Amino acid sequence: MQTLNAIKNADAKGDSFSSREFPMMDTDFDFIARMANEKTGIQLGKHKRDMIYSRIVRRIRSLNLQTFSEYCDYLKSHQNEEMTNFINAITTNLTSFFREEHHFDFLKDTVIPEIKSKNTVSKKLRVWSAGCSTGEEPYSLAMTFHSAFSDARGWDIKVLATDLDTNVVLHGKTGVYVQDRVDGLPASILKKNFNEVVPASGRGRAYEMSPHLKQYITFNRLNLLSDWPMKGKFDVIFCRNVVIYFNKDTQRILFDRYADMLKPNGYLFIGHSETLHGVTKRFESLGRTIYRKIS
């Protein structure tokens, strides 16, 4: 058993992680942080060590490895096979239906009436949920559009939902949510837009999105730092609680690319702790984390 002094000395050296079940040295964390930044743009500071430890440990166990150093070596030599698992492990997927409700109110009260008036000929609406996580955001968009366009015939409405994490993209495609993920929804919305199903665990309740909502959405994996295959432009882009993991230069590049992908006067919605101030001048602020492209 380590003495108290030994533990203090280890903490002082920054290598207290070396005494855990699966040792992780500073060099291991530095490699993981560097790889995360290279492949995804995500910045992992030292304060993220606990989080990274708990997430990568699952991969170490599944691969029957003994240390983080072994995992780092494995990742170096098996990048094609392991990189997707690595990225899935380090990404954060916190979301809920109608999160930041004022965004959906603005969409319903301001954006949709404007688009109905402006796109009378094409009758097209194109929206991108960038960083869609497990699908709550794009399905919230679909519910909003389905309700708002119920009296408007012939509209072609499509939501592109993308994320870096293949697991959450699959979850979104499936569209099944356990009870606690829908607890905040009014009973009327639940009844209108979900079908009760047997959860995979066989315990409790689960709800699947109705087919009339699934038809609006296309789920795809996409690394925001890679080339984008989309050809057409969007009326609205939601990119919320994504850029907080990027440095300022990466944020600027990303927001400028979003501006290029938006139609004239298109709308960008970002997360509550994010801002475009000091990052790009291609948008004007319309209120709390809501922006319009300057055309």
Residue ranges and their predicted role:
Residues K123-G135, K158-L160:
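Conserved class I S-adenosyl-L-methionine
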Residues T134-A152:
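Conserved SAM-binding loop of SAM-dependent methyltransferases across substrates and taxa
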Residues D151, W155-F238, V242-F246, T250, ...:
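Extended basic-aromatic, gly/pro-enriched interface segments that bind polyanionic ligands
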Residues S273-S295:
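Class I S-adenosyl-L-methionine
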